């Protein structure tokens, strides 16, 4: 049997075979490799060899493969195109532990009842092809900027715990309508689900909400009562920065959910961008500093 490898990223040979044949055990794979019943490009291969597009796996006809293969899944063309963009156009960093992408606004991180295309659905396609990507945090659909994606289970656990323990430093740029009273400060509030509108999050200083903390700094005064502000969330509550901007009296431009449509200028985009992420050496074994380029519409506003 001949298997042409078509995964878009290098992937361990043993894991790739297990995805094709879930009933194959590690011991059986390693024995078959030692006996050259399974080879790669006509060469003897180790289980940890990373195969990639263009490689060919040869399986001896006398080798008894398990009958059951993985379920055949069908992916939309849009998901396949997005998957390729994640690994090319959007990609700004990659190592053995993670990739970082610059997510555009209007693209959801995860799917939902009214969302057909998302980063998560594209990752499922890549994983079906042999990768092992896992989301470790999320950005609102309307928010652009840095999104980290783990490349394996162990890295996902490390990164998830780092976010949970507030070890990841994140900085966002926002253009707001109006300015805070103080140029530098801290916002603290409880954030929980609105009891009147389940689709909306509200500030509620009660036992129902969870504590949310955000540092902010006014960076620049722009035209038409618009201001550039840097936000640094300590916690990661849903819609936290959007709510805290509203609480400061300066909602984010383009925020239809928490802004005042009657007085704010119309904007096609929401001006909130995840600009910087810092990971200390203790998280994945090395210090990582990342920056995501501002989208064109954001840059035009602050020049």
Swiss-Prot record:
GO molecular function, one term: RNA binding
Pfam family, one: PseudoU_synth_2
GO biological process terms held by the UniProt record: enzyme-directed rRNA pseudouridine synthesis
EC number: 5.4.99.24
Record InterPro entries: PsdUridine_synth_cat_dom_sf, PsdUridine_synth_RluA-like_CS, PsdUridine_synth_RsuA/RluA, RluA_PseudoU_synthase, S4_RNA-bd, S4_RNA-bd_sf
Coiled coil ranges: none
Gene3D superfamilies from the UniProt entry: Pseudouridine synthase, RNA-binding S4 domain
Catalysis performed (reactions): uridine(955/2504/2580) in 23S rRNA = pseudouridine(955/2504/2580) in 23S rRNA
Active site: 140
The S4 RNA-binding domain, residue ranges: 11-87
Entry superkingdom: Bacteria
Keywords: Isomerase, RNA-binding, rRNA processing
SMART domains: S4
EC class name: isomerase
Family: Belongs to the pseudouridine synthase RluA family.
Known role: Responsible for synthesis of pseudouridine from uracil at positions 955, 2504 and 2580 in 23S ribosomal RNA.
Protein name: Ribosomal large subunit pseudouridine synthase C
Species of provenance: Rickettsia prowazekii (strain Madrid E)
Top-level taxonomy: Bacteria, Pseudomonadati, Pseudomonadota, Alphaproteobacteria, Rickettsiales
Name of the gene encoding the protein in the UniProt record: rluC
């Amino acid at each position: 049997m001949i298997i042409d490898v078509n995964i878009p990223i290098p992937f361990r040979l043993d894991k790739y075979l297990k995805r094709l044949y879930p009933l194959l055990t590690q011991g059986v794979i390693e024995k078959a490799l030692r006996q050259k019943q399974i080879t790669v490009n006509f060469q003897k291969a180790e289980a940890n060899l990373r195969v990639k597009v263009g490689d060919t796996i040869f399986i001896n006809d006398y080798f008894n493969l398990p009958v059951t293969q993985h379920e055949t899944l069908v992916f939309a063309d849009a998901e396949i195109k997005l998957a390729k963009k994640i690994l090319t156009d959007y990609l700004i960093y990659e190592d053995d532990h993670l990739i970082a992408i610059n997510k555009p606004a209007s693209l959801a991180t995860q799917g939902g009842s009214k969302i057909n295309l998302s980063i998560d659905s594209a990752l499922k396609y890549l994983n079906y092809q042999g990768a092992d990507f896992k989301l470790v945090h999320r950005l609102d659909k309307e928010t652009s900027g840095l999104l980290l994606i783990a490349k394996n289970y162990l890295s996902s656990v490390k990164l998830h715990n780092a976010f949970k323990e507030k070890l990841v430093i994140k900085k966002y740029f926002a253009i707001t309508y109006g300015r805070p009273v103080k140029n530098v400060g801290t916002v603290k509030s409880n954030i929980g689900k609105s009891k009147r509108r389940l689709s909306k999050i509200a500030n509620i200083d009660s036992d129902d909400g969870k504590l949310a903390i955000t540092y902010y700094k006014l960076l620049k005064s722009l035209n038409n009562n618009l201001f550039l502000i840097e936000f640094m969330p300590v916690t990661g509550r849903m819609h936290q920065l959007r709510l805290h901007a509203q609480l400061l009296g300066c909602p984010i431009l383009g925020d239809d959910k928490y802004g005042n449509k009657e007085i704010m200028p119309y904007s096609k985009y929401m001006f909130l961008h995840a600009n910087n992420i810092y990971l200390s050496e203790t998280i994945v074994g090395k210090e990582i500093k990342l920056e995501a380029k501002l989208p064109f519409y954001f840059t035009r506003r602050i020049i």
